[in-house]
Structures are given as C-alpha cells and as structure tokens.
C-alpha cells in the first residue's frame, strides 16, 4: 500500500535533505587547553542579587549580572519602587545599585499608581509584589498573556493576611492585581507570623523570606503544604545570610506543614557582590578540560 503525500505515511527524502547532509564535526583540541571563560551569571542568583541590592543599607556594586529579558524586567520593576541603577561597564553586567528608601517611594503615572510589567518572569511576578506591601503608593502588576495563567493566590492571600491591601483586577488569584501598603501596619509590626501554601511554587516562600528581613520584628513563615524546589528556597536563605541577614531554618526531618523559617530583621548589607555563573553553562567548558587535558577557569564560581 502506498501513502499519498500528506496522508501521514513515509515520504522519500529529496537530494540535499537532512539524510544526505554532511554530519557536523565536533572541534578537536590540538593540545591541552588553557583558558579563562567568562560566563553569564545565574538567572536565579541575578534576580535575588538585584532585589537585595535595591533594599540594601548602602550602595552595591554587582559583577557578572545576567542580561536577559527577566533581568530587564526586574530592573524596571525595582526602578518603579525607587531603586537606581548605573551601568559601569557598558555591557550591563557590571552595575552600581543605589537602594530605595523605606517606605519604598513608588514612581507613579498620571493615574497616581505605580505600574509594573512582570512579562513572564517568575521572580518578578512573585518577589516584587511582596515588596509593594512596603510601598507608599499602590502598584498594579500585569504581564504577558501566559503569565495571567500562572497562580498567584497563595502569595496574595499571605500578603493580605499580613495587612497589605490586595485588589484583584481580573480573575481572583491571577494577574492583573494591585498591591498597596494598607494602613502601613507592616512597617510597625514587632513580630509577624504568616502561613503560605507553597505547593504551587517555592517562589511564594522565597518572596516572603525576602520581605521578612525588612519588617521591624522579622517574619516567621510556615508553608502549609509540600514545597517543591526546596533548593531554591535554600538559595534565597544563603543570599540573605551573605548580606548579613540571620535566618533560622526548619529541622531537616520536619514534615510538610511543620517547616518554619524565621527571618530576623535588618536591611541587607551593601558592598561588592560577584554573581556566580550558572553551573549548566559552565559544565561544557569544564568537561572540555577533562577530555582534552589542561585547565579551564570560570571566574566568580
């Protein structure tokens, strides 16, 4: 039986098609390698470094920043909240960050509101709304069409429980929405506890941990369900500690609903920060040295 063209059966490959193309030839090292390879910074670490620098107690110089759409969206969002950024090298990977004052002073439009486009950047859509609870003016958040399908309810519910003013501007629990400071009680609280359903994203937990350091009495945070990607929560805790913020972590064997993080109050420390490259980008270059011999160095890692 012969299949007609377009009927889903096999068709003959024409000359010059993939079947007859020359195979790609991998490069071969002429000898042992000796190289220094500058790689872009980790996307996750770049987002956290920018946010903590924007909230620090003094200016911060960032080296090795990843330049991507997510980074550009984070820079724009933090600028709306009052932080300032100066490109020191012309490439956008070396920045001086002047932190925003508290309460965060929102750069508003003609309607008197701040507006932040989160695009499709998870760290912008989850981390930055938590900061808007400490702003002096409400901020409207929206993003790409696909972003409007990503869940936000656990974070928004937690912020409302902390006293923030949360207004849904579309389907409840999704973008777009508005977050404001409410009556400002968060900046007066001497001790704050909150629970969050972290089962949809560990970013909800990280967002509240980052917020907690700015509260006068810190924050005690208990996720109510299983938290995926606990390694990313660990990354958030590590970056907070590197900037001088004390964080108490739950016991290793604590079960779901029993894990509690305690963030002690304080503004992150400014200064010089080098952002570690992403391991997935570094891997091929390091493997090349193992195969060919010699040495390949990756700075800041």
Regions found by a protein language model. Give the residues of each.
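Structural preference for solvent-exposed beta-strand-turn elements
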Residues: 1-301
């Amino acid at each position: 039986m012969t299949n007609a063209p377009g009927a889903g059966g096999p068709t003959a490959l024409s000359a010059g098609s993939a079947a007859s193309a020359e195979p790609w030839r991998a490069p071969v090292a002429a000898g042992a390698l000796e190289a220094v390879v500058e790689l872009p910074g980790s996307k996750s670490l770049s987002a956290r470094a920018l946010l903590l620098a924007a909230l620090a107690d003094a200016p911060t110089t960032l080296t090795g920043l990843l330049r991507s759409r997510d980074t550009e969206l984070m820079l724009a969002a933090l600028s709306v909240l009052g932080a300032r950024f100066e490109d020191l090298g012309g490439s956008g990977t070396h920045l001086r960050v002047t932190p925003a004052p508290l309460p965060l002073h929102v750069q508003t439009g003609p309607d008197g509101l701040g507006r932040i486009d989160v695009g499709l950047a998870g760290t912008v859509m989850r981390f930055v709304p938590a900061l808007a609870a400490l702003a002096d003016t409400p901020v409207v958040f929206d993003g790409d069409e696909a972003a409007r399908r990503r869940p936000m309810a656990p974070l928004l519910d937690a912020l409302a429980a902390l006293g923030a003013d949360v207004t849904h501007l579309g389907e409840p629990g999704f973008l777009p929405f508005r977050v404001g400071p409410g009556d400002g009680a968060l900046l007066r609280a001497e001790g704050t506890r909150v629970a969050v359903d972290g089962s949809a994203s560990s970013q909800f937990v990280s967002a509240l941990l980052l917020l907690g350091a700015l509260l006068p009495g810190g924050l005690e945070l208990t996720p109510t369900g299983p938290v995926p990607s606990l390694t990313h929560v660990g990354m958030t805790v590590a970056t907070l500690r590197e900037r001088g913020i004390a964080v108490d972590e739950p016991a290793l064997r604590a079960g779901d609903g029993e894990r509690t993080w305690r963030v002690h109050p304080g503004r992150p420390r400014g200064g010089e920060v080098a952002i570690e490259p992403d391991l997935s980008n570094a891997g091929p270059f390091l493997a090349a040295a193992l195969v060919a011999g010699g040495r390949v160095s990756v700075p800041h890692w």
